[in-house]
């Protein structure tokens, strides 16, 4: 009899836990994805904070030249970072128990792997949690689809790119200056600015910002007048009121006259789909671009594409960009290479540009 009661109590406890996890009445929805998301993001956050403050220098290039990244080792908020794991580790999984000691684990940049793996799993579960809450509330699933764009970007720079390059030391550092270094080296090695997928991403982000500003300002300006002509239209409203405050027909008329008729949406759902889809598709393409360049399918190369009748090169902006790329490449990881492959495998490049002689 006692055993039976214990089983019922256990089953009842599990059922209550399930109901609590899936309840939409909680202040913050947990969900089954949240059961994984909460501990993984907590682990990533705690490790990041500790490493950013106190981690010792990391031998990122695997040549016994540690790079300092934490605040206690001389950095500030701008220069500080969690330094990626060592090139000596490569793509090997490097948890704490694989190192001979905690000092070795820290020296080889073990915290970086701990942070990015927990972060990527937690961020993925956050997307799943968005779908789960939408499902519980009877909503359509497009919120998590939009979130997949920044998630794909995170996977591209923290996982796909290191896999393609053969080492987690090539992943993006977790800090401000480290991110800038990652961007500069990426341009030097892959010419990302000349990659069409990155260009689509730029159009998506800047265009999305423009459309967001246009939409917000237009809606804010298209008030339904609740006051007399002698009073300010602002007096007819209070912040946070439930009633609709703007007239989409008036907004459509204004914008149609400002640009032209068919540049303006007269359907609210079509408008908001466009506002969501434009930046999302752009960022998707950027993530795809990073993922292809991870395997060295790089941006366009128009070097030496214009020559005169005698075969002499007439430099274009593509050649100027190439010269900048070479300069950035020879400066990074200075002691890790005897000579950059791009320079060692070709004829010597002049230090300064030479203006072509004009025989008139």
From Swiss-Prot:
> Tell me, what's a Pfam family for it?
Photo_RC
EC id: 1.10.3.9
Principal localisation: membrane
Among the GO molecular function terms of this UniProt record, one is: oxygen evolving activity
Identify the propeptide residues: 345-360
Gene Ontology cellular-component terms listed: photosystem II; plasma membrane-derived thylakoid membrane
Membrane topology designation: Multi-pass membrane protein
Q: Where does chlorophyll a ChlzD1 bind?
A: 118
Q: Which reaction does it catalyse?
A: 2 a plastoquinone + 4 hnu + 2 H2O = 2 a plastoquinol + O2
- Residues at site: Stabilizes free radical intermediate? 190
* Keywords of this entry: Calcium, Chlorophyll, Chromophore, Electron transport, Herbicide resistance, Iron, Magnesium, Manganese, Membrane, Metal-binding, Oxidoreductase, Photosynthesis, Photosystem II, Thylakoid, Transmembrane, Transmembrane helix, Transport
Q: Which residues bind pheophytin a?
A: 126, 130, 147
Where do the annotations place [CaMn4O5] cluster binding?
A: 170, 189, 332-333, 342, 344
Gene Ontology biological process terms in this record: photosynthetic electron transport in photosystem II; response to herbicide
Keyword Iron on this protein?
Answer: yes
Q: How is the cofactor bound?
A: The D1/D2 heterodimer binds P680, chlorophylls that are the primary electron donor of PSII, and subsequent electron acceptors. It shares a non-heme iron and each subunit binds pheophytin, quinone, additional chlorophylls, carotenoids and lipids. D1 provides most of the ligands for the Mn4-Ca-O5 cluster of the oxygen-evolving complex (OEC). There is also a Cl(-1) ion associated with D1 and D2, which is required for oxygen evolution. PSII binds additional chlorophylls, carotenoids and specific lipids.
Q: Where, by residue number, does the polypeptide cross the bilayer?
A: 32-53, 111-132, 143-163, 192-217, 273-295
Q: What else is known?
A: 2 of the reaction center chlorophylls (ChlD1 and ChlD2) are entirely coordinated by water.
What exactly does this protein do? Answer: Photosystem II (PSII) is a light-driven water:plastoquinone oxidoreductase that uses light energy to abstract electrons from H(2)O, generating O(2) and a proton gradient subsequently used for ATP formation. It consists of a core antenna complex that captures photons, and an electron transfer chain that converts photonic excitation into a charge separation. The D1/D2 (PsbA/PsbD) reaction center heterodimer binds P680, the primary electron donor of PSII as well as several subsequent electron acceptors.
* Name of the protein this chain belongs to: Photosystem II protein D1 1
Source species, please? Answer: Thermosynechococcus vestitus (strain NIES-2133 / IAM M-273 / BP-1)
GN (gene name):
psbA1
